[in-house]
Regions:
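Left-handed beta-helix
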Residues: 1-161
Length: 161
């Protein structure tokens, strides 16, 4: 018999929701800092996170090896993520090795491993969760609209709905 938090994360939306619930322990009941609740994971051996002098980080979980020089709000960043100066990440889940270039805006989305979001690109919005698949590049100035599911790289300046 199981008592406590459980969520099926078999969809993009449910995976995003579960990550957002980790950021809200008062309402979700998830306290990852509770010493009685063990977390079993495979953590890469990486240096500590680096938060740059002009970076802003609010209500977020930032894993080892991340380099934050821009703005990160209410987001979960996995190992080795880079957010360049002038970039904004909000209400997002970024998997290992994601790079968000200067001036890019990433909002309400999941970016899979090793995605590169080019300078000035926009991914997601205020509506349904956007998703960008593993290893893809979103070109500089490109736009990936809210709710889009991207499985091929997006060229510079291109728009994907």
């Amino acid at each position: 018999h199981f008592n406590g938090y459980w969520r099926d994360v078999g969809t993009i939306d449910s995976l995003w929701e579960a990550n957002m619930e980790v950021l809200d322990p008062e309402n979700s009941g998830i306290d990852i800092f509770d010493e009685k609740w063990k977390i079993y994971s495979r953590n890469p051996v990486l240096p500590a996170q680096k938060i740059g002098p002009r970076a802003v980080v609010q209500d977020s979980l930032i894993t080892e090896g991340c380099q934050i020089y821009g703005r990160v709000e209410h987001s979960v960043l996995s190992a080795g993520v880079v957010v360049e100066e002038g970039a904004t990440v909000k209400d997002a889940v970024l998997m290992d090795g994601v790079v968000v270039k200067a001036g890019a805006v990433v909002k309400r989305c999941i970016l899979a491993e090793n995605v590169v979001v080019g300078a000035g690109a926009k991914v997601g919005g205020d509506g349904p969760i956007a998703h960008v698949g593993t290893g893809l590049t979103i070109g500089a100035g490109a736009t990936v609209k809210e709710g889009a599911k991207v499985f091929d790289s997006v060229k510079e300046g291109e728009e994907v709905c």
